Regions:
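Carboxylate-rich, polar loop motifs that coordinate divalent cations or form catalytic acidic clusters
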Residues: 1-276
Length: 276
């Protein structure tokens, strides 16, 4: 699964797990080594929005005010991103790193450390999610729609004609099956077929609440685990096209969700991390 799903927004410090050759089961957790990294170690900010481990083994940290790289010993801050909020990180090859920020999409050449601002609609378009498919296709989720990189250019996809509508505020992307991608947005869960262009929007409603704002998502065994902005975590069964409430996380603002082996790790806004 793509590295940019490692989304933990931690306040005042970030804990980096220096992985040993063991699985992340409960019996193995005592064998993990933990190290705390803060601004005193060179981190650009103690608020971490995204963590991405690249194919060369470097850990990239997207913070509230910059981009950092951790090599296991030292932290290197990239001054080119100073003052920018980093939301998402991905790589398409061994050279280029794609960085989604509050001021647009940037491409970092890791050989030269040169950066390039990639124009989508406008240079200042906020990029919340950057995702690379299994075939190497780049998808970029922004506050004004989805952009797909193909044939050396970006193609814009809108869900509804109004780019400013909540459904086009994309917060997360995962890859499903048979050309299908699942996107979370402030206006619902989107099922999108990248080949046909067809899409369908799902929202949750019961006798007590209506939920359309989804903050993040993860896919595990034909089920989507969806973070919300105040209603905890919902589960969407793809085969049944039906929602259910996750009783372990019924309330709260979910900041991040990832899969670790067959477990779901949920990053909350102020209540730490829950493992399901």
């Amino acid at each position: 699964m793509e590295g940019n799903l490692w989304l933990y927004r931690l306040y005042f410090r970030v804990v980096i797990l220096l992985w040993l050759p063991v699985s992340l089961s409960a019996v193995d957790l005592p064998n993990l080594t933990f190290r705390t990294i803060t601004i005193s170690d060179g981190l650009s900010n103690n608020i971490i929005n995204t963590i991405y481990k690249d194919k060369r083994g470097f850990t990239w940290l997207g913070t509230q005010t910059g981009l950092d790289r951790f090599d296991g010993i030292n932290v290197k801050s990239f001054l080119q991103f100073s003052g920018r909020t980093i939301f998402s990180i991905a790589e398409t090859d061994s050279v280029y790193l794609w960085v989604g920020t509050d001021k647009g999409l940037w491409k970092l050449d890791r050989k030269t450390d040169q950066v390039e601002l990639v124009t989508l609609d406008t240079k200042s378009l906020e990029v919340r999610s950057v995702f690379v498919s299994q075939t190497g296709r780049l998808l970029v989720g922004t506050t004004h729609g989805l952009f797909i990189y193909q044939e050396s250019a970006f193609r814009k996809v809108l869900f509804g004609s109004n780019a400013l509508s909540s459904i086009n505020f994309i917060t997360g992307i995962v890859e499903g099956y048979k050309d299908t991608f699942w996107l979370t947005s402030q206006g619902g869960l989107i099922e999108y077929n990248i080949e046909t262009g067809q899409s369908k929007v799902y929202t949750y409603q019961d006798d007590e609440k209506f939920v359309s704002y989804f903050s993040c998502l993860a896919l595990l065994k034909e089920k989507l685990y969806l973070g919300t902005a105040g209603s905890g975590m919902l589960v969407f069964d793809i085969g049944k096209a039906a929602f259910s409430i996750c009783p372990e996380v019924e309330n709260g603002y979910i900041k991040s969700i990832i899969t670790v082996n067959d477990e779901i790790w949920v990053g909350t806004n102020g209540s730490g991390i829950r493992i399901i």
